[in-house]
Amino acid sequence: MAAQALALLREVARLEAPLEELRALHSVLQAVPLNELRQQAAELRLGPLFSLLNENHREKTTLCVSILERLLQAMEPVHVARNLRVDLQRGLIHPDDSVKILTLSQIGRIVENSDAVTEILNNAELLKQIVYCIGGENLSVAKAAIKSLSRISLTQAGLEALFESNLLDDLKSVMKTNDIVRYRVYELIIEISSVSPESLNYCTTSGLVTQLLRELTGEDVLVRATCIEMVTSLAYTHHGRQYLAQEGVIDQISNIIVGADSDPFSSFYLPGFVKFFGNLAVMDSPQQICERYPIFVEKVFEMIESQDPTMIGVAVDTVGILGSNVEGKQVLQKTGTRFERLLMRIGHQSKNAPVELKIRCLDAISSLLYLPPEQQTDDLLRMTESWFSSLSRDPLELFRGISSQPFPELHCAALKVFTAIANQPWAQKLMFNSPGFVEYVVDRSVEHDKASKDAKYELVKALANSKTIAEIFGNPNYLRLRTYLSEGPYYVKPVSTTAVEGAE
């Protein structure tokens, strides 16, 4: 088959209008294993295919792109970088986006290869074309360009090529295309900045990080909403958080939240700003962040009471993030009756809100109530029990009711709540004393889809592996759980059939 492909490739090179041959070659290549093509890589002459891309013939272009995609996979990245440099450069300025995407996918292979990447770094014109691809209308082209530049910047040589040459001017020039392209460049800068303190230093020296932060704290509310997402990404890294603190950015974000009450357009950016602090609290210290920025906690409580589903959703997510570790749980507990009212509100929403918000409420409840066995002190167990009882008059029945609704995602989210409390003795007693609950747990006929079966299995596993379960549930029920566990999540009980004499 490889020999047939090579023969057709030679025919394509020989003829002036080889449309039929391209169709045949395309068809043959689908059947040739890649390892066979690799053995013939030295004989693959791709020049004619690249030339055909310039003919402005739609079908030829489509066929050539597909053929080249297959043949280039058979070539080593170093070979592509050294021998097809001109073709790569032309590909990046081709009017057809599929050609650009093909070219960028090859550049993606090259930048992943430590031997080949130097060929790119030494080709200023090619780098410039990659930068200008960020400014194109096609999002896939822009994303591929950002990915390649981000990968290049992982090395010292790459950082120097991007930030200590004319490329920086090209980046700044591309940013002027429009707002969307400017945000794409910011996205690239934040990706690079997040790698290491040194990478961040290159990006701050370029002035682009400072420009982003100016927009974040500027007057345009829509720009703020976009910029806060990128700044939150930077805050996921320790060096990023340090930089934001040193530059006073965290204080500025807090001050904007303080002033949000008098801003009629605050609903555009407030969710992102509150999310920022929620992530910050979990990554650093919930207690320190909440004590230093009390407006953050205050705003979360306000948003939960809001009638705006967007605000409620963000507040619920943030409470879930904040309460995902013990320190955060204790910070919330200190707010006393306010937090009890908040729990009642979340419990109410988990029953009455639209499905998407119900799921977010259930996820937050799971996060708040979960306690790893090694952290189950008497005080913390009393706290989670008290929180659970604040959710509703009969929380166990509330979540059983939710789990019986015909939405797999909702069913799984309710099972996740049971799983979160399954290793806590007070919850095990509640489950055991709730009529029919143990039967519900071991009943395999309730779940019909894979996700639900997996979620039920996690609940059974959490119960069966608890040290207190045998004592509270009793040995017969404990053995039923162990049997379920050993049979796995997808076990189907065999149906016995009896042969009847004389039956057809």
From Swiss-Prot:
The modification N-acetylalanine is found at A2. Keywords: Acetylation, Chaperone. InterPro entries: ARM-like, ARM-type_fold, PSMD5. One of its GO terms (biological process) is proteasome regulatory particle assembly. GO terms for cellular component: cytosol; proteasome accessory complex; proteasome complex. Belongs to the proteasome subunit S5B/HSM3 family. Rich in dileucine repeats, which have been implicated in trafficking of a variety of transmembrane proteins. Interacts with PSMC1, PSMC2, PSMD1 and PSMD6. Part of transient complex containing PSMD5, PSMC2, PSMC1 and PSMD2 formed during the assembly of the 26S proteasome. Acts as a chaperone during the assembly of the 26S proteasome, specifically of the base subcomplex of the PA700/19S regulatory complex (RC). In the initial step of the base subcomplex assembly is part of an intermediate PSMD5:PSMC2:PSMC1:PSMD2 module which probably assembles with a PSMD10:PSMC4:PSMC5:PAAF1 module followed by dissociation of PSMD5. This is 26S proteasome non-ATPase regulatory subunit 5. The gene is PSMD5.
